[in-house]
Amino acid sequence: STPSNSSAASDVYKRQVDIKQSECTIYECIIDRANVQDAILDTEIDSLKVISSHINLVGAEIEMLNLPNREKILKEVLTPLKKEYDYILIDCSPSLGLITINALTAADSVIIPVQAEYFALEGISKLLNTIKIIKSKLNPALEIEGFLLTMYDSRLRQANQIYDEVKRHFQELVFNTVIQRNVKLSEAPSYGVPTILYDAESTGAKNHLALAKEIINRNK
């Protein structure tokens, strides 16, 4: 989860209060080494579980500075869950701080979202350099799962130019699926539900389902 807890808040609605009042979040697992099983929450989707973030995670990087093997804490937390779940998704903030480094160290692969805007391209090289360092120092098995175009509007020339540029550079690593601009994607979090439950027929929901299928097919 991101430090702001946005992913957890949008993926669950029945247990919103539980998340806000939960005594065990990913923060406690990282800082206090709480049992990760105690942090797992059910959702309205039977096969989907979440681990909530906490606002305290914003300052966790400072608390982690004096901890041993601080770059590998999240990996140690999540390793017991690997045999229980087909996929574990770690939602990261855009910043390349210690929490994100922990996520990249724990991950098997990374999905790189690219907003269909010019300035989004500037951050890619920095992220790729970080991934290169992580691979050489902390996680040799880390791979790029793919580049995902988001906030895409095919009517805009710039969006198509960005897509073509990313495709030219990264070729087969670019997902065929794009996440289009869709009002339902911005509405759903305000109701505390994932888009697939808010409006399964919306463009945003269909885009995410297509992405899920593409990821599954890539990993067969």
Stretches with model-predicted labels:
Residues 1-220:
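P-loop NTP-binding core
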